[in-house]
Design a protein with these regions (language model features):
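His/Asp/Glu-enriched, well-ordered alpha-helical/loop segment
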Residues: 259-342
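Metal-cofactor-binding active-site regions of metalloenzymes
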Residues: 83-89, 93-94, 109-136, 159-162, ...
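Histidine-rich, glycine-flanked metal-binding segment
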Residues: 1-55
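Active-site core of metal-dependent hydrolases
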Residues: 164-284
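C-terminal cap of metal-dependent C-N hydrolases
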Residues: 10, 333-381
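Hydrophobic faces of well-ordered beta-strands that scaffold small-molecule active sites
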Residues: 59-63, 88-90, 114-118, 156-160, ...
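Metal-associated gating/positioning segment near the N- to mid-region
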Residues: 41, 49-109
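Short, acidic/polar
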Residues: 69-77, 137-148, 199-205
């Protein structure tokens, strides 16, 4: 078999196939052709990736990439590809009034695979600082459903930022929350809920959710957390996770707390997905990128295989793209991440300026996106 690209000598970690071993990986025409234990093929280009970790292309389940239209958004290709990410889910930067523009200006033009959640607010996050749902007139559940029907496979779900200063307190907050739930049900998709300082408790939210719905910022601090007054994970949340409710990190500028994460993980409450909530306010710290966020979970005691699973296989399942994304199975799209694991002493900062010193850090050396190689360093040049 004549390959277009052959990666040799790397350690393949692919949780979708229970793989963690040195393999060669061959690519033909943008598709993974083979995973073999010995390089018996010729290739137009061969790269020795010994010492690197080969994973399915990382999937960031929470970022904001509606650049130039939403002030906090960032450039998908400049940040995602450099951070080892091949697929980005934009978490509600656009609503029903501007999702068509988001698709035209971003989804259809960038190299990164970009999908989008449709914000319950018709204007998305264009004026996020003012609270996009403080005026009830901006809530557009019918428009959300129409948008998802108009852009199948690109508009993949519903987003609401369920903080009291965004959706309102008391009954107003509940009304907006329930409109978002209804939009998800009516569109036959799923709902991502940003939890901030919410007008309801997490246990009060849970009865309205169904398997596949997602609570993001699950390790935030503040008044609304996954821990009850006894510093225990709410039993309702443990039951919800077993039922199929998704818990996502969404690190962000204000939504990851070392103490909450340490306590919850010590009690066996492991999130489904690792994501960044990357945007202008955290791009240069404390988030930086996906590998840095993943490294924080290595420090919390999770295994490399688990961290990669939470960044590839599980997000693909959330998106309904398991077997297509988040895997290195032959015949699938050649979306691949090359990671390097460094040993040393590294500062890891949460969203509350708390620093932990970790001994292992991941960085992205490069990616393959649809068979095209992008390198971030001279290591493989």
């Amino acid at each position: 078999m004549q390959l277009d690209l052959l990666l040799t000598g790397g350690t393949v970690v692919d949780p979708s196939q229970n793989l963690h071993e040195i393999r060669d990986l061959g690519i033909v025409g943008g598709t993974i052709a083979d995973l073999s234990e010995s390089g018996s093929y010729s290739a137009s280009k061969t790269i020795d990736v010994s010492g690197l970790i080969i994973t399915p292309g990382l999937i960031d389940l929470h970022a904001h990439v509606y650049k130039r239209h939403v002030p906090l958004s960032i450039d998908a290709d400049a940040t995602a590809l450099a951070g080892g990410v091949t697929t980005v889910l934009d978490a509600g930067s656009a609503g029903s009034y501007n999702f068509a523009g988001f698709k035209h200006d971003v989804i259809d033009r960038v190299e990164t695979e970009v999908l989008g959640l449709v914000n319950l607010s018709c204007i998305g996050l264009v004026a996020a600082n003012f609270g996009e749902l403080m005026d009830d007139r901006y809530a557009d559940p019918e428009g959300v459903v129409e948008t998802i029907l108009q852009f199948p496979g690109k508009a993949v779900g519903v987003k609401i930022r369920a903080s009291a200063h965004i959706i309102g307190s008391g009954q107003q907050g509940w009304d907006n929350f329930l409109k978002a739930v209804k939009a998800a049900r009516d569109s036959d998709t799923w709902l991502m809920i940003h939890i901030g300082e919410c007008p309801m408790t997490l246990p009060e939210m849970i009865p309205h959710l169904q398997p596949g719905d997602c609570i993001t910022h699950c390790f935030k601090g503040g008044s609304t957390t996954v821990l009850n007054e006894d510093n225990q994970v709410y039993p309702e949340l443990i039951a919800a996770k077993k039922k199929g409710i998704i818990f996502d990190i969404g690190h962000g500028f204000g939504s990851f707390n070392w103490d909450i994460a340490t306590t919850a993980i010590a009690q066996g409450f492991i999130p489904n997905c690792i994501s960044t909530d990357l945007h202008q306010m955290n791009l240069h710290g404390p988030v930086f990128d996906m590998p840095m966020t993943m490294s924080k979970f290595l420090h919390l005691g999770l295994s490399l295989d688990d961290v990669i699973d939470m960044s590839t296989t599980q997000p693909a399942q959330v998106l309904g793209r398991a077997g297509e994304l988040g895997t290195l199975k032959p015949g699938t799209v050649a979306d691949i991440t090359l990671l390097e694991q460094h040993a040393g002493q590294f500062n890891f900062t949460d969203s509350y300026n708390q620093i932990r010193i970790g001994g292992s850090k991941l960085t992205a050396t490069g990616i393959v996106r649809r068979g095209k190689l992008h390198l971030n360093s001279n290591r493989l040049a």
